[in-house]
UniProtKB/Swiss-Prot annotation:
The gene is lpxD. It catalyses: a UDP-3-O-[(3R)-3-hydroxyacyl]-alpha-D-glucosamine + a (3R)-hydroxyacyl-[ACP] = a UDP-2-N,3-O-bis[(3R)-3-hydroxyacyl]-alpha-D-glucosamine + holo-[ACP] + H(+). The active site is at 239 (proton acceptor). This is UDP-3-O-acylglucosamine N-acyltransferase. GO terms for biological process: lipid A biosynthetic process. Keywords: Acyltransferase, Lipid A biosynthesis, Lipid biosynthesis, Lipid metabolism, Repeat, Transferase. One of its GO terms (molecular function) is N-acyltransferase activity. Pathway: Bacterial outer membrane biogenesis; LPS lipid A biosynthesis. InterPro entries: Hexapep, LpxD, Trimer_LpxA-like_sf, UDP_GlcNAc_AcTrfase_non-rep. The keyword Nucleotide-binding does not apply.
Length: 341
């Protein structure tokens, strides 16, 4: 088990210890469930009552919250960011693979960097390049001509089709499929003609892709996911999409083809973005927002209808269907009221 003193954490987080700086911390926990040897955090004032009752050995607090706290604290600028840093330091997540399992199938042309680990029944295709300390989980398939940067981790049962490049320090979760064909077809007299998807996928450094998400390859050029992007579970990224640096996309969101999303965007869960659109840097879409036009300015956008009692929803639905009729009636009334007698 890893452990660290509060003094060491204060140096890591540029914080100030309030209490015993020799106290040893071995893990993180919530205020409600923390016990001795654990550090917790207060990032939301609605949990203030739990602060007074917590059994944590120490708590990450802002300077304001630390003023009235009598227990041991590490005072930092942002307690939630501090929590994330400490959680990384004390992380006990097992590796996706250790060593090279004898059942792994590795093409002789593949190049493996120092410290590469490959799990049981994984398949490594022709001309694949794996950087140093790459971890390939059991049952994962890496198609030909793929490149994976150092320290990247693929969990069990990930599939990379051919010509997919992953940067350094990426995490790809189980069930993710990267490089499958985009939805490209031409219609000739009612019959669909498949367009070969000859592009690839290019993913930058420090990208995380959630379980069962799908990233389609480009039709001609590449689908691009830039540095620092985080993608939740069950997200669909279509052919030739471009996602800018440090953008976050929550679960069950769907991007149609040739969408360009800027840097530092936050896309809420269950959003749908139509094809061939551009979304500016710094756009925030709340959950279940449907985007059908370009977004040129940063800001918060929403379109979903909030939940309500069924009887109220039914009434509003009927009224919505009557809006055009109501508009025409109002327009007629306004016209008649402006007519001189």
């Amino acid at each position: 088990m890893k452990s660290v003193t509060l003094k060491e954490l204060s140096l890591l987080l540029d914080g100030v210890v309030q209490g015993d700086e020799t106290l040893v911390i071995n893990s993180v926990a919530t205020l409600e469930h923390a016990t001795a040897g654990q550090i917790s955090f207060l990032a939301n004032s609605k949990y203030r009552a739990q602060l007074e009752l917590t059994q944590a050995s120490a708590v990450l607090l802002s300077a304001k919250d630390a003023q009235d706290y009598s227990g041991t604290a590490l005072v930092v600028k942002d307690p939630y960011v501090g929590f994330a840093r400490v959680a990384q330091l004390l992380d006990t997540t097992p590796k996706a693979a250790i060593g090279i399992h004898p059942s792994a199938q590795i093409d002789p042309s593949a190049l493996l960097g120092e410290g590469v680990a490959i799990g049981a029944n994984a398949v490594i295709g022709a001309n694949v390049i794996l950087g140093e300390n790459v971890q390939i989980g059991a049952g994962t398939v890496i198609g030909q001509d793929c490149i994976i940067g150092s320290n990247t981790r693929l969990w069990a049962n990930v599939t990379l089709y051919h010509n997919v490049h992953l940067g350094q320090d990426c995490i790809i979760h189980s069930g993710a499929i990267i490089g499958s064909d985009g939805f490209g077809y031409a219609n000739e007299r009612g019959q669909w003609i498949k367009i070969p998807q000859t592009g690839g996928v290019r993913i930058g450094d420090r990208v995380e892709i959630g379980a069962s998400s799908t990233i389609d390859r480009g039709a001609l050029g590449h689908t691009e996911i830039h540095n620092g992007v985080i993608i939740d579970n069950q997200v669909q990224v279509a052919h030739n999409d471009i996602i800018g640096e440090n953008t976050a996309i929550a679960g069950s969101t769907t991007l149609a083809g040739s969408v360009t999303i800027g840097k530092h965007c936050i896309i809420g869960g269950n959003c749908a973005i139509a094809g061939h659109l551009t979304i500016a840097d710094g756009v925030h879409l709340s959950g279940a927002t449907n985007v059908t036009g370009n977004m040129r300015e940063p800001g918060l956008y929403s379109s979903a209808t909030v939940a309500m009692e069924n009887k109220v929803w039914r009434k509003n639905t009927v009224r919505f269907r009557q809006l055009d009729e109501l508009f025409q009636r109002v327009k007629t009334l306004e016209k008649n009221s402006n007519t001189p007698e």
